[in-house]
UniProtKB/Swiss-Prot annotation:
The IQ domains provide the interaction surface for the myosin light chain MLC1. The calponin homology (CH) domain binds to actin filaments. Keywords: Actin-binding, Calmodulin-binding, Cell cycle, Cell division, Coiled coil, Cytoplasm, Cytoskeleton, Nucleus, Repeat. It holds the Pfam family IQ. Residues 41-147 form the Calponin-homology (CH) domain. InterPro entries: CH_dom, CH_dom_sf, IQ_motif_EF-hand-BS, RasGAP_C, RasGAP_dom, Rho_GTPase_activation_prot. PANTHER family: CALPONIN-HOMOLOGY (CH) DOMAIN-CONTAINING PROTEIN (PTHR14149:SF14), RAS GTPASE-ACTIVATING PROTEIN WITH IQ MOTIF (PTHR14149). GO terms for molecular function: actin filament binding; calmodulin binding; cytoskeletal anchor activity; GTPase activator activity. Gene3D superfamilies: 1.20.5.190, Calponin-like domain, GTPase Activation - p120gap, domain 1. This is Ras GTPase-activating-like protein rng2. Residues 734-770, 1330-1364 form a coiled coil. Interacts with calmodulin cam1. It comes from Schizosaccharomyces pombe (strain 972 / ATCC 24843). Component of the contractile F-actin ring; required for its construction following assembly of F-actin at the division site. SMART domains: CH, IQ, RasGAP.
Length: 1489
């Protein structure tokens, strides 16, 4: 029965009378442990309530709170509460897993980051494994004080000491503390410790606000007050006697010096209560003042120096019979305190000076290095700025000088022109005309003045706004540079000012304040002048606008006044105008009379000016019509030239014989001169005829090869001269061998990585079971040792290259059939495509389909060479066609369960074109990744909250809307600027991608082209945008997005990227994904990218044009220059490497659905192979039992015999080989002549010599496909070749009319493509090296992950070994006698042995039934273990001998049976039936407890 336990009850129990001395000691220790446990539960309750107050959630009862902290979820939530700006991923799980350590590490990083002293930190094992949970509670207490002192968190409230806990809770805590052997921290000294850290030493007067008086502070009379000088890990119970003795000795020593007895506390207090005021009894120094005594004024000076522990209070609170003495003077107390503080300050000062002296050399060196770096950096910045400023100032000066010179020149010209009288006359004449025009214009303007004013204001406003927008755009681009330059200049100015300040302080300490004030005032004036100068242009513009507005307003007022008085001034104006006109005419007439000659001269000048103007106009008109004039002139010249040519031809026609004779004489002369030069050169170089011959032969061979390469129908003899080019050199052979080894290594690396991943997953499961204490460490070590880090078995690394010579007849037969089987699957893509359709039709799970995709990629060698890449692309194309015919919409082709996407991802899942993507994404990554603080957050609500953080914290404020956020000018400006930057980045990416579209991998282009063809075929109603939208999504998400969003995975950037940088990349990716979707959409669907809708639509059109270029590719056979007959022409067979289980799995799957994937024709190649192989159980045992990799040299045997198309190809290739041998023996003008030419003995001898050379060459390199040619005579060879050509002529592949020139052209094409094959092989080698590099990097990552798991296992092993103990046997029990018998026989198992009666196991439910064995009463079952995870079950009977009484059981088999819900297990040949769950329970309880 649970009984509530309170502090009063515990204290009453502690004070109860007890019996003997020994029992008193034990009881006191037990009560002390109970009090400690109760006090610790109170501290746990305080920590729980503080966390609940911070998080606002209920954390359950106090008794389970300590264990609930082990997964770190509560601590991680606490971190998220105090750091809301950081995204923290918290791992939740009901079961404790190793990944919970991430939550704990986040909390440890948090307390380290905020500066919590390391003395309060705990280790990961303290909380995860529960080794020291009190230290975790102590850390939470310290964190609460640390944050509450900074007003970042609520204070921790002391729990009421009348809390009630059950006896069971207290006993659990006592038992746990006793087992862990952990010393409880001193929670009571924690608050004072933080007060000590926060208080300055030199404080003389107590401040009522320095230490807030919360509920956690108690008075001096409280029984649990602790010393501020005690260690955090000092237990009050352990240092009880030490404090008592030290306090007592200190008091006695102090009073022994005064030769008086020790007074009591009351005797000291009484005089001071009467004589001293209340405020004089307060503590003199808040540094020594306990926080619990701030509010108590009636304390004596002796209380200040007494240690605030229970024993010391008890010491001074008891009255004694000692004699009274006079009170101590207050000055003495102050002096003692001052001396104490002085000693402490001097000690600290000495320590500080000593540390500074010890580190002075390092500090001086560091300061010198820093000053040097700052000086060099400042010099570089100033020099760069000075160079830029010099260039700028030079250009400004040159512009200014030019402007001044032009102004002076214009001024001089105007002055010279003003002196001329002609200008005066012209001005007078023009003045009259202008005044007339002015009056008429004024009258018209009066009608349209309001409209003009409105138009002008609108235009000025538009121009002003446009100029401001342009100016802001330019400023936004230079804001980061301005900020950086300003920060550098401010820092430099600040350092200069600070150095000057220090110098001035050291030199002139008296004028320090005046210098500072003067400096500050000058700085403020300079800053004000600088800001005003920076806005000078704006002020000038504002003044101009103001003056213009005032002038227009004054002009408008004058016009209104004039309009009001128009009627009264009309008559007066007419009279005045008439008078002025008459007077003006008279003056003009007089001036004309005086300047008659000048007028005539002016008129002549005016006529000259008019004439020159007309001429200029005419010239301008002619220049505009210049192309027409040139065209007309050229036509006229052509007519004239043709007339001259016709006349010349007529003249030459009459002299043709003479011209021909002259030309022949000239040619003869030139030829004779050329021949004579060659003859002289030959005679001159007669001494070195070998060089001449080699030059001549080289020229002849060059001409012959040019003829072979360019001629449409090259001669047979030309082809014969270059037949040797078809032979492979030693270098070619070495490259082929290297390429094969590389392919083999790639396949092996892929499998190794998969093996490690599977092993890591198994270890993860085993570790989880180990943590839950379900299995022992030894079972985990079984997997650990099976694939230990850095040690792999030689059998796993050794590749079993099974050859045809090392197998027996049966195995050789099956291996050859499997080689034919996989060749058929490779070369005919319809079989595998139909196989996947059959799987999807049967509703196969996605896991099995992915496994089938993995196996199929192994058949094609993951496209590691040219041949397999062509075949794989053809297979993917066929799968796309079949799936496009079955889907309902075009978008369904992009679903994740489409087989063609799985195939392409497995084939091109890794990006190999790193250099290409560095070119395309270089600028984007430089902008987004280089700056760690760049943020492209475009949500206006978030931006508004960043400018107004108080809005987010106010709960009673109205709901924030998007329109309200956009009305905020800073938010709107930042939103627009970030959209503008994103638009620039998108434009740069699209331009770079368009420029490098030719470098995109061919596999991606071909797959996109096949996708386009399939969509156009099966969705004829789909418009162009829809089709290219599907292609764009595929290209973007399959190839572009992974590189753009995760550049660190592809080594495009150095190191890793932060969460903010990845968020910026995702923002840019959102815009690009919308652009690549091609199809138009409503602008409302763009969300916050709505202002970019016009840009996105335009970019979609450009992207569609780019995708059209991307899908414009040739067939794989043309691109890779792959011949359909290449497998039969090459002397080396294609090779793939597969495991025995994969071979049998693929074969069994294909054989199961053979009726669905192959036509019903019996002669079908696939059916023929499957029928020959038969079921898997009937195959050769040696081949089936082999678990290593098998080398399959693919054999086209069935294709050449059964398949008509393959038979035709084989016929063509064999005939070409026969012709190659024939033309090397005999010569002729054409192929038909050589074939019908009779065979002589010399031809037979030459044929035998050729066979001997070929045999030696092939024996050194590799085997040929067909060895029958070496058994033929030359006559038989010619007869076979002629028969094949006749057969090909019947099939339409050869024609006798052109002497079988088609065969010669085909051989010439093979010769020309030989060098291209070498280049292609080199490209394959480069691609293989890159693939191996990527696979090795992945292997390194997997190895590091495996190493971490292994280290955890080693740590767990050490933990369990330290706790492992040997159970004691009960004397004279059945187990005791059983173990004694085993020791006598020397057969004691390593891990134990247990013997049970069968009846007992039957009663427990372990044994279900017994058959063909003795009865349960007479049968005994023995279970023993001598190896890890391996148990021996033995049945014995004392009366009857049991046949075959032993069997072995493996723990993996038992766990698998339990996992597969197998209820019973049959052992001993079915004679015993065991309950699976109960038997496993028995095993775990006996061998793994």
């Amino acid at each position: 029965m649970d009984v509530n336990v309170g502090l009063s009850r515990l204290q009453s129990q502690a004070g109860a009378p007890v019996g003997t001395k020994g029992s008193n000691t034990r009881l006191a220790a037990k009560q002390r442990e109970t009090l400690q446990a109760y006090d610790y539960l109170c501290r746990v309750d305080e920590a729980k309530k503080w966390i609940e107050e911070c998080l606002g959630t209920d954390l359950g009862p106090t008794s389970t709170f300590e264990q609930s902290l082990r997964n770190g979820v509560v601590l991680a939530l606490l971190v998220q509460k105090f750091q809301p700006d950081k995204l923290i991923k918290i791992f939740y799980s009901n079961e404790l897993q190793f990944r919970h350590s991430d939550n704990i590490n986040k909390f440890l990083d948090f307390i380290h980051g905020i500066g919590l002293p390391e003395i309060f930190h705990f280790e990961l094992t303290d909380i995860y494994e529960g080794k020291n949970l009190p230290k975790v509670i102590y850390c939470i207490h310290a964190l609460s004080y640390f944050l509450s002192m900074q007003d970042l968190a609520p204070p921790l409230i002391k729990s009421d000491e009348n809390l009630s806990f059950t006896d069971e809770d207290v006993s659990i805590i006592v038992r746990r503390l006793r087992q862990s052997n952990v010393i409880l921290p001193n929670f009571k000294a924690l608050s004072a410790d933080f007060m000590l850290r926060a208080s300055p030493v030199s404080s003389r007067t107590p401040s009522p606000t320095r230490f807030p008086k919360h509920a956690r502070f108690q008075t001096l009379n409280s029984s649990d007050s602790a010393s501020i000088y005690s260690s955090p890990y000092t237990s009050p119970t352990l240092e009880f006697s030490k404090k008592d003795a030290s306090a007592r000795s200190d008091i006695l020593k102090m009073h022994r010096r005064t030769k008086s007895a020790t007074p009591s506390l009351e005797q000291f207090n009484e005089p001071y209560k009467q004589t001293l005021p209340s405020h004089s009894i307060e503590f003199e120094d808040s540094f020594f003042q306990p926080p619990s005594q701030k509010g108590h004024m009636q304390r004596s000076f002796l209380t200040t120096f007494s240690a605030p522990t229970r024993r010391r209070e008890a010491l001074f609170s008891t009255t004694s019979g000692l004699s009274q003495r006079s009170p101590v003077d207050e000055k003495i107390v102050n002096a003692i305190q001052a001396c104490g503080r002085g000693v402490l300050v001097r000690l600290r000062l000495v320590d500080m000076l000593q540390s500074l002296v010890e580190q002075s050399s390092s500090v001086v060196l560091l300061q010198a290095v820093i000053r040097g770096y700052i000086s060099r950096n400042t010099y570089r910045i100033r020099k760069k700025a000075y160079d830029e400023l010099v260039n700028w100032v030079t250009s400004i000066q040159s512009i200014s000088r030019a402007y001044l010179i032009r102004a002076q020149y214009r001024k001089v010209v105007l002055q010279e022109e003003a002196t001329k009288s002609i200008q005066t006359l012209q001005s007078i004449i023009r003045g009259g005309f202008y005044r007339r025009k002015y009056h008429s214009l004024i009258e018209r303007l009066d009608l349209f003045t309001p409209s003009f004013v409105l138009i002008q204001s609108s235009a000025l406003g538009f121009l002003t706004r446009h100029a401001i927008v342009n100016m802001l755009d330019n400023l936004y681009n230079y804001i980061p540079l301005f900020n950086r330059m300003q920060s550098i200049l401010r820092a430099n100015m600040f350092r200069n000012e600070w150095s000057n300040f220090l110098d001035s302080v050291q030199s002139f300490p008296v004028s320090f304040h005046s210098i500072c004030k003067g400096r500050l005032i000058r700085d403020s004036i300079n800053r004000l002048n600088g800001s005003l100068l920076g806005e000078l242009d704006n002020f000038i513009k504002l003044q101009n606008l103001s003056r213009g507005f005032m002038i227009r307003r004054a002009f408008k007022e004058k016009l209104e006044k004039l309009k009001a008085s128009t009627s009264s001034f009309i008559a007066l104006q007419a009279i005045v105008r008439a008078f002025l006109l008459r007077k003006n005419l008279e003056s003009i007439y007089d001036s004309f009379q005086k300047s008659h000659l000048s007028v005539i001269k002016a008129q002549s000048l005016y006529r000259g000016f008019i004439t020159r103007t007309k001429i200029d106009y005419c010239n301008d008109y002619l220049l505009k019509r210049l192309p027409d004039i040139v065209f007309m002139q050229s036509a006229v010249r052509a007519i004239l030239l043709r007339d001259d040519v016709n006349y010349t031809e007529v003249q030459l026609d009459s002299f043709i014989p003479e011209i021909v004779l002259l030309q022949s004489l000239i040619r003869g002369y030139l030829s004779r001169n050329k021949f004579s030069r060659k003859l002289q050169n030959f005679h001159k170089n007669m001494e070195n005829p070998i060089v001449a011959k080699s030059i001549f032969r080289g020229r002849q061979e060059g001409l012959a090869y040019r003829e072979l390469a360019t001629a449409k129908n090259p001669p047979v003899m030309t082809v014969k001269n270059f037949v040797h080019l078809l032979d492979d050199t030693n270098f070619d052979f070495e490259e082929e061998v290297l390429l094969e080894k590389m392919r083999k290594e790639i396949v092996q690396q892929v499998r190794d990585n998969e093996e490690i991943e599977v092993h890591i997953n198994e270890l993860d499961v085993k570790i989880a079971l180990l943590v839950k204490n379900k299995i022992s460490l030894d079972d985990v070590l079984k997997h650990h040792n099976k694939y230990k880090f850095g040690k792999q078995s030689t059998e796993y690394l050794k590749i079993n290259t099974l050859s045809m010579k090392s197998l027996n007849n049966s195995s050789r037969k099956f291996l050859e059939l499997y080689q034919c089987f996989f060749y058929v699957l490779q070369t005919n893509e319809m079989y595998l495509a139909n196989y996947f359709q059959a799987l999807k039709t049967e509703g196969t799970s996605s896991v099995k389909i992915r496994h089938a995709v993995y196996l199929v990629l192994q058949i094609f060698g993951h496209g590691s060479n040219r041949r397999e890449e062509v075949l794989l692309l053809r297979f993917i194309s066929q799968v796309i066609k079949l799936e496009a015919a079955l889907v309902n919409s075009s978008q369904d082709l992009l679903s994740d369960d489409c087989v063609w996407k799985l195939l392409f991802t497995g084939y091109r899942g890794d990006v190999r074109e790193v250099k290409l993507w560095k070119t395309i994404l270089g600028r984007i990554h430089k902008v987004l990744v280089a700056d760690n603080h760049l943020d492209f957050e475009i949500n206006p609500l978030t931006l508004f909250k960043s400018f107004n953080p108080e809005v987010a914290s106010q709960t009673d404020s109205p709901k924030l809307t998007l329109s309200l956020a956009m009305q905020h000018p800073p938010t709107r400006n930042l939103y627009v600027s970030r959209l503008r930057e994103l638009r620039k980045l998108c434009q740069s990416f699209l331009v770079a991608l368009s420029k490098n579209i030719e470098n995109i991998p061919y596999a991606l282009c071909y797959t996109a082209a096949q996708l386009k063809n399939s969509l156009q075929r099966y969705f004829p109603a789909a418009h162009k945008e829809e089709i290219f939208g599907v292609i764009g999504k595929f290209v973007y998400w399959a190839y572009v997005a992974p590189v753009l969003v995760s550049p660190d995975n592809f080594k495009l950037v150095d190191g890793s990227i932060t969460a903010l940088q990845r968020k910026n990349l995702y923002t840019l990716s959102s815009i690009l994904s919308e652009i690549f979707s091609i199809e138009s959409c409503d602008s409302k669907q763009l969300g916050f990218f709505r202002p970019l809708s016009e840009f996105i639509e335009v970019s979609k059109q450009d992207t569609m044009l780019m995708l059209e270029r991307l899908v414009d590719v040739v067939d794989p056979e043309v691109y890779f220059e792959f011949d359909a007959f290449e497998d039969l022409v090459n002397t080396k067979r294609p090779v793939i490497y597969m495991k025995r289980d994969d071979i049998l799995g693929i074969y069994s799957s294909i054989a199961y659905v053979i009726d669905s994937i192959a036509p019903p024709d019996v002669n079908d190649p696939l059916r023929a192979v499957v029928n020959s192989l038969g079921p898997v159980s009937e195959q050769d045992n040696d081949f089936v039992q082999d678990e290593t990799d098998v080398k399959l040299e693919l054999n086209p045997k069935f294709c050449t015999i059964e398949n008509p198309v393959a038979q035709e190809r084989t016929l063509i290739v064999q005939t070409k080989r026969y012709i190659l041998f024939i033309i090397r023996i005999q010569n002729g003008l054409n192929l038909l002549e050589i074939l019908v030419k009779p065979v002589t003995d010399s031809d037979e001898a030459a044929w035998q010599n050729l066979l001997a050379e070929e045999s030696e060459k092939n024996a050194r390199n590799y085997d040929l496909f067909d060895d029958s040619i070496f058994s033929m005579s030359f006559a038989e060879l010619k007869y076979t070749a002629l028969s094949n050509i006749v057969e090909m002529e019947k099939l339409g592949f050869a024609n006798r009319r052109n002497n079988y020139q088609d065969m010669v052209n085909s051989i010439a094409l093979d010769i020309r493509n030989k060098s291209r094959r070498r280049m292609q092989r080199q490209r394959e080698l480069d691609a293989g090296h890159q693939s191996l590099l990527n696979l090795r990097e992945k292997r390194a990552f997997l190895d590091s992950q495996l190493k971490s798991y292994n280290e955890y296992i080693e740590q767990a092993m050490e933990t369990l070994q330290s706790k492992k103990g040997k159970k004691k046997l009960i004397p004279f029990s059945k187990q005791y006698f059983h173990m004694r018998d085993l020791r006598k026989s020397g057969r004691v198992p390593r891990f134990g042995s247990f013997k049970y009666p069968a009846l007992k196991l039957y009663d427990r439910g372990v044994l279900v039934s017994i058959s063909h064995m003795p009865q349960k009463e007479k049968l005994y079952i023995t279970i023993s273990a001598d190896e890890v995870g391996k148990f021996i079950l033995e049945a014995t009977s004392p009366t009857v001998k049991v046949s075959s009484p032993r069997c072995e059981l493996h723990l993996d088999d038992l766990l698998s049976a339990q996992y597969n819900k197998v209820l019973t297990l049959d052992v001993l040949d079915g004679r015993l039936k065991l309950n699976t769950n109960m038997f496993l329970h028995l095993i775990f309880s006996k061998f793994y407890s």
